[in-house]
Amino acid sequence: MGFVKVLKTKAYFKRFQTKYRRRREGLTDYYARKRLIIQDKDKYNTPKYRLVARATNTRIIAQIVYATLKCDRVLCAADSYELKRFGVSTGLASYAAAYATGLLLARRLLKQIGLDTVYAGQTKVDGAYFNVDEDQKEKKPFKAILDAGLVRTTTGNRVFGVLKGACDGGINIPHSESRFPGYVRASDEGESSKYKPEDHKARIFGKHIDAYMKHLKGQSNEAFQKQFSKWSKTLEAAKVDSVEKLFTKVHAEIRKNPERVKSTKKNDKPKRDHKKFYPTKLTAAQRKDRVKTKFQLALSQ
Protein backbone atom coordinates (compact mmCIF):
# COMPACT_ATOMS: atom_id res chain seq x y z
CA MET A 1 0.00 0.00 0.00
CA GLY A 2 1.34 3.39 -0.96
CA PHE A 3 1.77 6.43 1.24
CA VAL A 4 -1.50 8.25 1.93
CA LYS A 5 -1.25 11.85 3.05
CA VAL A 6 -3.64 12.73 5.87
CA LEU A 7 -5.70 15.77 4.91
CA LYS A 8 -7.23 17.90 7.63
CA THR A 9 -10.55 18.76 6.08
CA LYS A 10 -13.22 21.25 7.01
CA ALA A 11 -15.01 18.52 8.98
CA TYR A 12 -11.85 17.89 11.03
CA PHE A 13 -11.53 21.53 12.07
CA LYS A 14 -15.28 21.85 12.65
CA ARG A 15 -15.31 18.97 15.14
CA PHE A 16 -11.93 19.72 16.73
CA GLN A 17 -12.07 20.21 20.51
CA THR A 18 -9.27 22.10 22.21
CA LYS A 19 -7.91 20.98 25.55
CA TYR A 20 -8.26 23.15 28.65
CA ARG A 21 -5.97 26.15 28.70
CA ARG A 22 -3.91 24.95 31.69
CA ARG A 23 -3.42 21.55 30.00
CA ARG A 24 -2.30 23.21 26.77
CA GLU A 25 0.21 25.27 28.75
CA GLY A 26 1.49 22.16 30.54
CA LEU A 27 0.35 23.32 33.99
CA THR A 28 -2.41 20.89 35.03
CA ASP A 29 -2.98 17.21 34.32
CA TYR A 30 -6.77 17.10 34.60
CA TYR A 31 -6.88 13.31 34.17
CA ALA A 32 -4.79 12.90 37.34
CA ARG A 33 -6.38 15.88 39.14
CA LYS A 34 -9.86 14.37 38.87
CA ARG A 35 -8.68 11.23 40.67
CA LEU A 36 -6.73 13.20 43.28
CA ILE A 37 -9.54 15.48 44.48
CA ILE A 38 -12.83 13.56 44.11
CA GLN A 39 -14.02 12.29 47.49
CA ASP A 40 -16.48 9.49 48.32
CA LYS A 41 -20.12 10.48 47.88
CA ASP A 42 -20.98 9.62 51.50
CA LYS A 43 -18.41 12.09 52.88
CA TYR A 44 -19.36 15.73 53.26
CA ASN A 45 -16.94 18.65 53.59
CA THR A 46 -14.06 16.20 53.97
CA PRO A 47 -11.45 17.30 51.43
CA LYS A 48 -8.57 15.22 50.17
CA TYR A 49 -5.30 16.95 51.04
CA ARG A 50 -2.54 16.92 48.43
CA LEU A 51 1.19 17.33 48.91
CA VAL A 52 1.97 19.50 45.88
CA ALA A 53 5.71 19.34 45.13
CA ARG A 54 7.25 21.41 42.35
CA ALA A 55 10.92 21.80 41.39
CA THR A 56 12.18 24.74 39.34
CA ASN A 57 15.70 25.60 38.17
CA THR A 58 16.45 27.54 41.36
CA ARG A 59 14.12 26.35 44.13
CA ILE A 60 11.82 23.68 45.54
CA ILE A 61 8.21 24.54 46.41
CA ALA A 62 6.03 22.33 48.64
CA GLN A 63 2.41 22.96 49.62
CA ILE A 64 -0.48 21.19 51.32
CA VAL A 65 -3.52 21.98 49.15
CA TYR A 66 -7.19 21.01 49.17
CA ALA A 67 -9.81 21.64 46.49
CA THR A 68 -13.13 23.47 46.89
CA LEU A 69 -15.88 24.10 44.35
CA LYS A 70 -14.60 27.62 43.84
CA CYS A 71 -10.82 27.18 43.90
CA ASP A 72 -7.86 25.37 45.46
CA ARG A 73 -6.85 26.54 48.92
CA VAL A 74 -3.36 26.28 50.41
CA LEU A 75 -3.33 25.04 54.01
CA CYS A 76 0.44 25.31 54.49
CA ALA A 77 3.46 26.02 52.30
CA ALA A 78 7.26 25.88 52.42
CA ASP A 79 9.94 27.05 50.02
CA SER A 80 13.60 26.07 49.76
CA TYR A 81 14.44 29.81 49.84
CA GLU A 82 13.51 29.64 53.54
CA LEU A 83 16.51 27.35 54.11
CA LYS A 84 18.70 30.45 53.91
CA ARG A 85 17.85 31.32 57.51
CA PHE A 86 19.04 27.85 58.55
CA GLY A 87 22.40 28.35 56.83
CA VAL A 88 21.86 26.92 53.32
CA SER A 89 22.34 29.75 50.85
CA THR A 90 23.20 27.70 47.74
CA GLY A 91 22.08 24.44 46.15
CA LEU A 92 18.44 25.28 46.87
CA ALA A 93 17.23 23.05 44.03
CA SER A 94 19.19 19.93 45.05
CA TYR A 95 17.77 16.64 46.37
CA ALA A 96 19.05 17.45 49.86
CA ALA A 97 17.23 20.81 49.75
CA ALA A 98 14.07 19.03 48.53
CA TYR A 99 14.15 16.71 51.57
CA ALA A 100 14.73 19.64 53.95
CA THR A 101 11.82 21.57 52.36
CA GLY A 102 9.50 18.58 52.81
CA LEU A 103 10.60 18.24 56.44
CA LEU A 104 10.03 21.96 57.02
CA LEU A 105 6.53 21.74 55.53
CA ALA A 106 5.58 18.74 57.66
CA ARG A 107 6.79 20.20 60.95
CA ARG A 108 5.18 23.58 60.19
CA LEU A 109 1.84 21.99 59.28
CA LEU A 110 1.71 19.72 62.34
CA LYS A 111 2.53 22.66 64.60
CA GLN A 112 -0.23 24.66 62.90
CA ILE A 113 -2.88 21.99 63.61
CA GLY A 114 -1.49 21.01 67.03
CA LEU A 115 -0.08 17.56 66.20
CA ASP A 116 3.65 18.35 66.34
CA THR A 117 4.05 16.86 69.83
CA VAL A 118 1.93 13.80 68.99
CA TYR A 119 3.76 12.85 65.78
CA ALA A 120 7.50 13.52 65.79
CA GLY A 121 8.16 11.44 62.67
CA GLN A 122 11.54 9.88 61.97
CA THR A 123 13.99 11.82 64.15
CA LYS A 124 16.99 9.70 63.11
CA VAL A 125 17.33 9.93 59.33
CA ASP A 126 18.54 6.62 57.91
CA GLY A 127 16.94 6.57 54.44
CA ALA A 128 14.82 3.50 55.25
CA TYR A 129 11.10 3.31 54.47
CA PHE A 130 9.03 5.14 57.08
CA ASN A 131 5.39 6.15 57.29
CA VAL A 132 3.35 7.21 60.29
CA ASP A 133 1.31 4.37 61.78
CA GLU A 134 -2.39 5.23 61.98
CA ASP A 135 -3.08 3.00 64.98
CA GLN A 136 -0.24 3.98 67.29
CA LYS A 137 -1.80 7.19 68.67
CA GLU A 138 -5.19 8.39 69.85
CA LYS A 139 -5.38 11.12 67.22
CA LYS A 140 -5.15 10.08 63.61
CA PRO A 141 -2.15 11.41 61.69
CA PHE A 142 -2.58 14.03 59.00
CA LYS A 143 -2.96 12.23 55.67
CA ALA A 144 -2.06 13.64 52.25
CA ILE A 145 -1.56 12.33 48.71
CA LEU A 146 1.43 13.19 46.54
CA ASP A 147 0.67 15.52 43.62
CA ALA A 148 3.68 15.40 41.29
CA GLY A 149 2.05 17.42 38.50
CA LEU A 150 3.28 16.80 34.95
CA VAL A 151 6.86 15.92 35.90
CA ARG A 152 8.27 12.53 34.88
CA THR A 153 8.22 10.44 38.04
CA THR A 154 11.55 8.74 37.43
CA THR A 155 13.53 7.04 40.19
CA GLY A 156 15.41 9.64 42.23
CA ASN A 157 13.31 12.64 41.17
CA ARG A 158 13.42 15.59 43.58
CA VAL A 159 9.64 15.33 44.02
CA PHE A 160 10.25 12.12 45.98
CA GLY A 161 12.81 13.96 48.10
CA VAL A 162 10.00 16.29 49.23
CA LEU A 163 7.81 13.22 49.83
CA LYS A 164 10.46 11.53 51.99
CA GLY A 165 11.04 14.71 54.00
CA ALA A 166 7.30 15.13 54.64
CA CYS A 167 6.94 11.47 55.71
CA ASP A 168 9.92 11.71 58.07
CA GLY A 169 8.37 14.93 59.40
CA GLY A 170 5.22 13.11 60.55
CA ILE A 171 2.70 13.29 57.67
CA ASN A 172 1.05 10.07 56.52
CA ILE A 173 1.55 9.79 52.74
CA PRO A 174 0.89 6.42 51.03
CA HIS A 175 4.00 5.46 49.04
CA SER A 176 6.65 2.80 48.44
CA GLU A 177 10.43 2.98 48.16
CA SER A 178 10.45 2.02 44.45
CA ARG A 179 11.11 5.63 43.31
CA PHE A 180 13.69 6.57 45.92
CA PRO A 181 17.41 6.82 45.09
CA GLY A 182 19.01 3.48 45.94
CA TYR A 183 16.21 1.34 44.54
CA VAL A 184 17.40 -1.22 41.97
CA ARG A 185 14.80 -2.88 39.76
CA ALA A 186 14.75 -6.60 39.06
CA SER A 187 17.00 -7.57 36.15
CA ASP A 188 16.44 -10.03 33.31
CA GLU A 189 19.19 -12.26 34.74
CA GLY A 190 16.91 -13.21 37.63
CA GLU A 191 18.10 -10.78 40.28
CA SER A 192 15.24 -9.51 42.42
CA SER A 193 14.62 -5.83 43.08
CA LYS A 194 16.22 -4.34 46.19
CA TYR A 195 16.39 -1.06 48.04
CA LYS A 196 19.58 0.37 49.56
CA PRO A 197 18.66 2.88 52.30
CA GLU A 198 22.29 3.97 52.70
CA ASP A 199 22.32 5.27 49.10
CA HIS A 200 19.18 7.27 49.76
CA LYS A 201 20.63 8.62 53.01
CA ALA A 202 23.72 9.78 51.10
CA ARG A 203 21.49 11.85 48.78
CA ILE A 204 19.47 13.28 51.67
CA PHE A 205 22.63 14.61 53.34
CA GLY A 206 24.34 15.68 50.10
CA LYS A 207 27.26 13.25 50.38
CA HIS A 208 27.50 13.12 46.58
CA ILE A 209 28.22 16.87 46.64
CA ASP A 210 30.99 16.33 49.20
CA ALA A 211 32.50 13.53 47.11
CA TYR A 212 32.61 15.58 43.93
CA MET A 213 33.97 18.64 45.76
CA LYS A 214 36.82 16.53 47.11
CA HIS A 215 37.48 14.98 43.69
CA LEU A 216 37.49 18.31 41.85
CA LYS A 217 39.70 19.99 44.45
CA GLY A 218 42.31 17.28 43.92
CA GLN A 219 42.14 17.71 40.14
CA SER A 220 42.19 21.48 39.69
CA ASN A 221 41.79 24.31 42.18
CA GLU A 222 40.64 26.65 39.39
CA ALA A 223 37.86 24.25 38.35
CA PHE A 224 36.91 23.80 42.01
CA GLN A 225 36.55 27.56 42.55
CA LYS A 226 34.50 27.89 39.39
CA GLN A 227 32.12 25.07 40.37
CA PHE A 228 31.96 25.24 44.17
CA SER A 229 32.92 28.77 45.25
CA LYS A 230 29.40 29.43 46.59
CA TRP A 231 29.36 26.13 48.47
CA SER A 232 32.72 26.99 50.06
CA LYS A 233 31.33 30.32 51.30
CA THR A 234 28.18 28.60 52.61
CA LEU A 235 30.16 26.00 54.57
CA GLU A 236 32.48 28.68 55.92
CA ALA A 237 29.55 30.84 57.07
CA ALA A 238 27.90 27.84 58.78
CA LYS A 239 31.23 26.88 60.42
CA VAL A 240 31.15 23.28 59.15
CA ASP A 241 33.54 21.39 56.89
CA SER A 242 31.08 19.26 54.88
CA VAL A 243 27.64 19.40 53.28
CA GLU A 244 26.58 16.39 55.35
CA LYS A 245 27.23 18.22 58.63
CA LEU A 246 25.47 21.30 57.26
CA PHE A 247 22.23 19.44 56.52
CA THR A 248 22.42 17.55 59.83
CA LYS A 249 22.47 20.95 61.51
CA VAL A 250 19.63 22.22 59.27
CA HIS A 251 17.35 19.26 60.11
CA ALA A 252 17.82 19.89 63.83
CA GLU A 253 17.10 23.62 63.43
CA ILE A 254 13.95 22.92 61.40
CA ARG A 255 12.58 20.65 64.13
CA LYS A 256 13.40 23.28 66.73
CA ASN A 257 11.54 26.15 65.02
CA PRO A 258 9.66 25.45 61.76
CA GLU A 259 7.52 28.60 61.83
CA ARG A 260 7.71 31.13 59.02
CA VAL A 261 9.66 34.28 59.86
CA LYS A 262 8.08 37.52 58.72
CA SER A 263 10.12 39.72 56.42
CA THR A 264 11.92 42.59 58.15
CA LYS A 265 12.31 44.69 55.00
CA LYS A 266 11.37 48.32 55.51
CA ASN A 267 9.42 50.18 52.88
CA ASP A 268 11.43 53.34 52.24
CA LYS A 269 8.84 54.76 49.87
CA PRO A 270 6.44 57.18 51.62
CA LYS A 271 2.76 56.32 51.54
CA ARG A 272 0.82 58.13 48.86
CA ASP A 273 -1.72 60.68 50.07
CA HIS A 274 -4.76 59.68 48.04
CA LYS A 275 -6.86 62.56 49.41
CA LYS A 276 -4.55 64.88 47.55
CA PHE A 277 -5.56 63.41 44.19
CA TYR A 278 -9.18 62.39 44.77
CA PRO A 279 -11.69 65.07 45.92
CA THR A 280 -14.03 64.20 48.77
CA LYS A 281 -17.57 63.27 47.80
CA LEU A 282 -20.14 66.03 48.42
CA THR A 283 -23.39 65.45 50.26
CA ALA A 284 -26.80 66.14 48.68
CA ALA A 285 -27.16 69.45 50.59
CA GLN A 286 -23.71 70.61 49.48
CA ARG A 287 -24.51 69.81 45.84
CA LYS A 288 -27.75 71.82 46.01
CA ASP A 289 -25.94 74.80 47.56
CA ARG A 290 -23.32 74.65 44.83
CA VAL A 291 -26.02 74.69 42.11
CA LYS A 292 -27.71 77.66 43.81
CA THR A 293 -24.43 79.58 43.96
CA LYS A 294 -23.70 78.95 40.27
CA PHE A 295 -27.26 79.98 39.31
CA GLN A 296 -27.05 83.26 41.26
CA LEU A 297 -23.62 83.98 39.77
CA ALA A 298 -25.03 83.49 36.26
CA LEU A 299 -27.99 85.84 36.97
CA SER A 300 -25.74 88.57 38.36
CA GLN A 301 -23.73 88.62 35.14
Curated annotation (Swiss-Prot):
GO terms for biological process: ribosomal large subunit assembly; translation. Residues 257-283 are annotated as: Disordered. It is found in: Cytoplasm; Nucleus. InterPro entries: Rbsml_uL18_euk, Ribosomal_uL18_C_euk. It comes from the Eukaryota. Pfam families: Ribosomal_L18_c, Ribosomal_L5e. Disulfide bonds: none annotated. One of its GO terms (molecular function) is 5S rRNA binding. Component of the ribosome, a large ribonucleoprotein complex responsible for the synthesis of proteins in the cell. The small ribosomal subunit (SSU) binds messenger RNAs (mRNAs) and translates the encoded message by selecting cognate aminoacyl-transfer RNA (tRNA) molecules. The large subunit (LSU) contains the ribosomal catalytic site termed the peptidyl transferase center (PTC), which catalyzes the formation of peptide bonds, thereby polymerizing the amino acids delivered by tRNAs into a polypeptide chain. Belongs to the universal ribosomal protein uL18 family. Component of the large ribosomal subunit (LSU). This is Large ribosomal subunit protein uL18. It comes from Tetrahymena thermophila (strain SB210).
